[in-house]
């Protein structure tokens, strides 16, 4: 049986203050592979390297994971404040239009923590900083 390909959106991290990486938590990869019986595909949150139409055609579904960085308040009509914390603008540029395209197409996805906030913002909602 061919396992469905499930895209997992990566988070941007800096290692040793200089080395930028795209990463996904092992627990998310294990959940896709073992629980959902899918083939995990780690999707870098790098807008210049990722084409949303290609992703949608290749993946049966997506997982939008949690992460330290928050959705930038500009995405829901607010100005950033210190309460918002750090941001990952590249991830915003991938996830928000991807979610909108998935909803339009009726393709399945799951949002966890930040991922659920991305779904909310992509659908026109706002967030409260804490």
Language model feature labels by segment:
Residues 113:
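Conserved G/P- and acidic residue-centered "switch" motifs that form tight phosphate/ATP-binding loops
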Residues 116:
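The feature captures the ABC ATPase H-loop/switch
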């Amino acid at each position: 049986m061919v396992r469905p390909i499930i895209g997992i959106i990566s988070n941007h991290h800096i290692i040793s203050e200089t080395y930028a990486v795209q990463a996904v938590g092992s627990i998310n990869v294990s959940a896709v592979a073992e629980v959902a019986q899918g083939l995990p595909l780690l999707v870098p949150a790098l807008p210049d390297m990722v084409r949303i139409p290609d992703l949608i055609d290749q993946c049966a579904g997506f997982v939008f994971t949690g992460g330290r960085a928050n959705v930038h308040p500009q995405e829901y009509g607010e100005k950033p404040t210190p309460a918002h914390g750090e941001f990952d603008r590249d991830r915003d540029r991938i996830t928000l239009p991807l979610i909108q395209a998935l909803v339009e197409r009726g393709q399945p996805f799951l949002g966890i923590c930040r991922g659920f906030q991305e779904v909310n913002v992509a659908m026109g909602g706002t967030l409260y900083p804490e």
